[in-house]
């Protein structure tokens, strides 16, 4: 059984991983953290420094720190079809390392990208998607869509067993408000009928 931290006790990586195990996948913030921007020239993007969390397994979380900006080249565009590449922060469980890479999309008239890989080999979050226009020789800001706040692909890390279900809470609050409104409207109609009877 792991108990962390205790005095005079030696620990392994999996023990610290258990400490990080309740943190959700995602980035530290969406403000300049793992920001993806066009390179000055050619088919390439830049990724700013950032801090993120990934999962080795259910009870083993890892922190990933990119300390300095990197540049990622993108493969050549097609002359007629488009594709969407994805900028991925991932844990390579087989090689025992983290990395930021380009996941190349398929050429298509209506391109889409696949879901993040989260299995025995990799754990991934998507930082941004990059539209590679037909015949493109460079990347613009309009070609890049940040995925940092999209919880299907990335999201902000939260410390807890589960994130706060804000959408469900909003739906419950709306249903409660609508129910109260209908009740009050019914009472108002009854009061109006009573007053009409008195007058």
Residue ranges of predicted features:
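Beta-strand-rich solenoidal segments
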Residues: 5-11, 50-194, 198
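N-terminal "first-domain core" detector
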Residues: 1-59, 69
């Amino acid at each position: 059984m792991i108990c962390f931290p205790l005095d005079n006790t030696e620990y392994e990586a999996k023990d610290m991983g258990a400490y990080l195990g309740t943190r959700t996948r995602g980035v530290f913030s969406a403000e300049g953290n793992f920001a993806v921007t066009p390179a000055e020239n050619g088919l390439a993007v830049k990724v700013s420094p950032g801090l993120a969390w990934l999962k080795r397994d259910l009870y083993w979380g890892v922190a990933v720190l990119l300390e300095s900006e990197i540049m990622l080249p993108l493969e050549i565009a097609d002359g007629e079809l488009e594709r969407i590449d994805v900028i991925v922060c991932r844990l390579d469980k087989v090689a025992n390392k983290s990395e930021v890479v380009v996941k190349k999309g398929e050429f298509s008239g209506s391109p889409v990208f696949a879901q993040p890989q989260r299995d025995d080999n990799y754990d991934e979050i998507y930082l941004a998607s990059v539209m590679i226009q037909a015949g493109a020789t460079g990347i613009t800001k309009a070609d890049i869509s940040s995925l940092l706040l999209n919880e299907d692909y990335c999201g902000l890390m939260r410390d807890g067993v589960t994130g706060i279900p804000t959408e469900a809470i909003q739906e419950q609050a709306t249903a409660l408000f609508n129910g109260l409104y209908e009740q009050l409207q019914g009472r108002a109609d009854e009061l109006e009928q009573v007053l009409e009877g008195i007058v």
